[in-house]
Amino acid sequence: MKINRKWTNKRVQWGHPIGEHETIAGKQAKIASDTFAMDAVWKVASTMADNKHFDIRLEAAIAKLFNTVAHYELLQQTLQIRGGRGFETADSLRARGEEGIAIERLLRDSRVNLMVEGSSEIMHLFIAREALDFHLQHIGALFKPGVSLGGKIVAFLKMMKVYALWYPTLWIPVLSASQFGMDNRLNRHMRTVARISKKMSRTLFHKMAIHQKKMAEKQLLINRFVEIGTELFIMSAACSYADSLKADGPNAANAVELADYYCKEATIRIKKLFSDIGRNNDAATLKLNHRFMQGEFEWLEDEIAKS
């Protein structure tokens, strides 16, 4: 943030500091709010870990997934804002009398975090497995090979007993935002989190009812649910963190503003994810990949310019 703040005030194009141009302004607003969200996530997850009474496997996975992806994207945008200077080494910049900020090196160092200690793809699968665990516990017996008809009937009756109590609660609206006891803006976002959580659970249940045991193979579909769940956790963490900073005087207003902005942007992304769950191009994607793996597009490889 400091690198961008100093540079976008110093660098002038078309008569204005580049930070005043809307294209850069959009990037910097995201950098600021995402940095706050990253800070919130690791602090919330760390606090839960220190408590020793929480099973934080899911929260830790979400924190790893979000923070590594967000950090890499932040550096990508910083590189873009710095322009050609972003590719220079620190020594090269200092030799020209400028501050030695090696953004491209930071970007390369950050990139490895998307692959080690659980790649982003593995994190998606782990989070999905945790999210589906409730359903797998209750419907798994229906699809186990070798289970007798009587066993499946018993499993079905047990499943119906559980879902008859659980499913109706997903349709109960969240009426009051004040119950969260935060700033009004944060309360509204927490109400949104509660409302969308119910919608996500309903939608996931409906998709599982449609795809049944094949649901585990629908990774493109599942990943959208993972992204929604991740966004909801980050929104909750951002609101909680902003609320905890109330005692810090002037930082409190800034914290609420940052959390408010992040949550508004996250809500827009969530709406798009729900839309993609309902209508997507997954079948064509898988078909095209199959043709790719069969070598049907080798002619594109032959058209590459050779030195």
Show where each model-derived region lies.
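Flavin-dependent oxidoreductase catalytic core characteristic
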Residues: 1-307
